[in-house]
Amino acid sequence: MICADALYAGYDGKVILENVSFSVGEGEIVGLIGPNGAGKSTLLKTLRGILPMLSGAAMLMGDDIKVLAAKDFARRAAYLQQRVEMTFDYTARDIVLAGRYPYLSWWRQEKADDLAIAEACMEYTGVLELADKPLHTMSGGQRQRVLLAKVLAQQTPVLFLDEPATGLDLIYQEEIFRFCRALCAAGKTVLLVAHELSLAARFCSRLLLIGRGMLLADGAPQEVLTDELLTHAYGAPVRVAENPITHHMEVYTEAEKGDAEKAQLLSVILGTPDEGRTA
């Protein structure tokens, strides 16, 4: 369904990702993980055709993404972007109905079936009661669920989700991952960016670890989420252990490193005099 071959990606003349190769099959939920700035969102935008490839190749459902027309692309893959700034008074219903645009001719407005699909998606993500509320007046979590409903309304076989759990509370974070797993069980393919490593370990069939502009690891969660790989990628001590209650993998950091230096900086910020320092 998704294939990248020796892909180089970036923007503004800067190379962010180098020589990235992987494939995602039908029905898989694959998580892109790694530190901030590693290139996860850049990779997703490149695969979606938002950013141009610097070199290499990328395929979507067997076709080169460079030759796909906009509507054809939109019928194959929906994209949930990381941040959406909205100042106009578009309501949740307006936003979700926009997910139906790949199926509309320029002269055709939404019909009853489009509205029914949009409302079903809003009900599924728990925002139907917000249908007439402007998006810019909503909380971050409400807005994220509206945007997820829009992606669903697009009814595509492939979903690119950039941090779909951002801004959500613990219950909805897990619900998003459960929902993605249900989609994949129905045959859809999901490639998502995740910072919630413990949830990614539970719900993703595979993980791609991005770090230092490269694909550092590709495999099952237990193969990728190791102390050594995560410490290398994040540049700080990371530990992976089994939760004795849930028996799921949990990821921890060792915060002690650098605490002494941070304490000195905090004393400056708070105006706390150091020992031996005279006024």
Predicted features and spans:
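Catalytic Walker B motif of ABC-type/P-loop ATPase nucleotide-binding domains
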Residues: L159-D162
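Helix-to-loop junction immediately C-terminal to a conserved catalytic motif
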Residues: R48
